[in-house]
């Protein structure tokens, strides 16, 4: 978990960051998670990796800012997704909590102040904005797209 979600991000940032620093412009958007902001039972490795990614984002943003390179983190919450991967992940989470998949999804929905899961397009729109020139004054930020989950 740490090797892919944290070390992989570090290696990618180091590689593309050198190019962006040389050209004195660029935007890196790291996809973390609300697990990078709060803890979740039964997922210590994932939580550690995502907290690390948030910290890495802030540190690298400070390093790269003088060279015109922006680095931000996007922290999605519970996202509605019908992919095979998401199905397996939901099943694993449900099993760890001792509930069925349908019951698990309703628990996630009830935990959202908006009473709905985040849509994939909402996360994509935030990533697109962070990468765009419209966000040229934003670096070192942690942007949540979580239906208000972390506002509590």
Residue positions per predicted region:
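The catalytic Tyr-X3-Lys active-site helix of short-chain dehydrogenase/reductase
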Residues: 8, 39, 44-52
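C-terminal substrate-recognition "lid" of short-chain dehydrogenase/reductases
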Residues: 10-13, 17, 21, 114-145, ...
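Active-site helix of classical SDR
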Residues: 13, 49, 57
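Active-site loop immediately N-terminal to the catalytic Tyr-X3-Lys motif
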Residues: 38-44, 66-67, 115, 133
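Short, small/polar-rich loop/turn modules that mediate ligand/substrate recognition or access, typified
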Residues: 65, 70, 138-140
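A glycine/serine/threonine-rich, flexible loop-to-helix segment
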Residues: 80-111, 122
């Amino acid at each position: 978990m740490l090797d892919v979600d944290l070390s992989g991000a570090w290696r990618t940032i180091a590689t593309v960051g050198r190019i962006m620093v040389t050209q004195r412009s660029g935007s890196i958007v790291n996809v973390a998670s609300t697990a990078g902001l709060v803890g979740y039972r039964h997922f210590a490795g994932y939580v550690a990796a995502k907290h690390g990614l948030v910290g890495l984002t802030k540190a690298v943003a400070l390093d790269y800012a003088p060279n015109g390179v922006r680095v931000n983190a996007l922290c999605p919450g519970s996202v509605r997704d019908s992919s095979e991967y998401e199905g397996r992940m939901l099943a694993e989470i449900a099993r760890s909590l001792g509930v069925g998949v349908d019951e698990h999804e309703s628990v996630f929905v009830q935990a959202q102040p908006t009473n709905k899961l985040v849509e994939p397009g909402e996360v994509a729109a935030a990533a697109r904005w962070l990468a765009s020139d419209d966000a040229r004054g934003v670096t070192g930020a942690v942007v949540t797209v979580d239906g208000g989950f972390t506002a509590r």
